[in-house]
Amino acid sequence: MEPIVVTENLWKLYHAGKVEVPALRGVNFKVLTGEFVSVMGPSGCGKSSLLYVLGGLAQASRGHVLVDGNDLVNMGDAERTKLRRHKIGFVFQRFNLLPTLDARGNIAIAQHIYGDGFDPHRFEVITKMLGLTDRLKHRPSEMSGGEQQRVAIARAIVNEPKIILADEPTGNLDTQNSEIVLSMLSQLNKELGQTIVMITHNPEAAAYSNRVVHMRDGVIVDGVPAD
């Protein structure tokens, strides 16, 4: 498999007054096409900063970030936004669903805004796989947290992105709903070959991935392939 994500000597610095604080310090990282990789580490170790830089939501300070062969560091804002919309799907701890739209609308709007228009076949495949067929007419306020997160996942993958970046996707969920969401991410990886990078502090969540990478103080300290 070819790598779909590559970072080379990646640095991310934040400014605290006149002081530069490194969140990422020379990170070298690869994700192969079709992998499900979990990034673990204590709070403040840089794992969310890594995900935001990989997704083009934050600018690298130094180094290179290649996503599907495109170096985000050498792109302008418009190019980076275009790549993000067409090649990357995001799943966050907060569901960020539009409260006035039902589940169908929250998913379909991604096809209209970021895709080539509504694709009924793709929509049906994804919503069926995520167990949302009987929830499509429900608004977010009428759904459980787990159901809302499944809608958010459907919205993220409905346009067939090259990679899903998930930042603590089960952080607001109870144990039962966490297991459902993680099982569905694993299913998407195994059945559709969806590449996923997931940030988590939970070893039980990381166990659903193919490989676990550990971070500390802005660097990757190891990466353990799953048995």
Segments the model singles out, each with a brief description of its role:
Residues P3-M215:
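ABC family nucleotide-binding domain
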